C-alpha cells in the first residue's frame, strides 16, 4: 500500500536515505554505504555504490534498484492481468539486464531488457500469453515513468 492515498486517488510514497561518515579524506576516502527506509515497510535497504565507483559489492546499488523496480512492476502487472484473464501462472523468473551508457553527456541507464520466463498451466496459447505480457508492459507504471526504453522479451512454457 502507498504511504498515503489522497481523496482524488493520487498515491504518495516516501523514502528516507541516511548516511553518516566523513568526506574529509577526499573522493576515495568515504564510505558509500547508506540506508533507505520507506514507510510503512519495516525493512530497510542497505545500499552502496557500484563497486567500480568505490562501492561495496555485497550491497545493492541504485542502478540495480531501478532495474529491480522495472522487473518487479512488470511481474506484478502481468500477474494481475493473467489472473483477471483466468490464466493460471505457475512460475515466473525474469533475468533482467540494464546497460549504463558513458557516451557524451551524463552517465545514464541506456536500456533495460526484461526477459521473463513464464510458466502457465495448459490451456491458453503462447500468442495469448505474450499479448498479456505486452499489455502488462503498457500498464507498468515504473516503465511508463522511465526515460530509458524498457524492452520485454518473454518466453512462455507450460507446466505438466
Where are each of the predicted segments found?
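Extended beta-strand/beta-hairpin segments
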Residues: 1-68, 76-160
Amino acid at each position: 500500500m502507498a504511504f498515503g492515498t489522497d481523496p482524488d486517488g493520487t498515491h504518495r510514497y516516501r523514502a528516507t536515505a541516511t548516511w553518516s561518515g566523513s568526506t574529509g579524506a577526499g573522493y576515495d576516502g568515504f564510505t558509500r554505504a547508506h540506508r533507505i527506509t520507506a514507510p510503512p515497510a519495516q525493512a530497510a535497504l542497505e545500499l552502496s555504490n557500484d563497486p567500480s565507483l568505490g562501492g561495496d559489492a555485497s550491497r545493492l546499488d541504485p542502478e540495480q534498484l531501478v532495474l529491480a523496480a522495472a522487473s518487479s512492476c512488470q511481474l506484478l502487472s502481468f500477474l494481475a492481468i493473467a489472473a483477471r484473464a483466468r490464466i493460471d501462472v505457475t512460475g515466473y523468473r525474469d533475468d533482467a539486464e540494464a546497460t549504463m551508457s558513458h557516451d557524451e553527456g551524463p552517465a545514464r541507464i541506456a536500456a533495460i531488457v526484461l526477459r521473463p520466463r513464464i510458466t502457465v498451466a495448459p490451456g491458453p496459447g503462447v500468442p495469448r500469453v505474450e499479448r498479456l505480457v505486452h499489455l502488462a508492459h503498457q500498464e507498468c507504471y515504473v516503465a511508463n515513468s522511465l526515460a530509458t526504453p524498457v524492452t520485454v522479451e518473454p518466453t512462455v512454457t507450460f507446466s505438466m
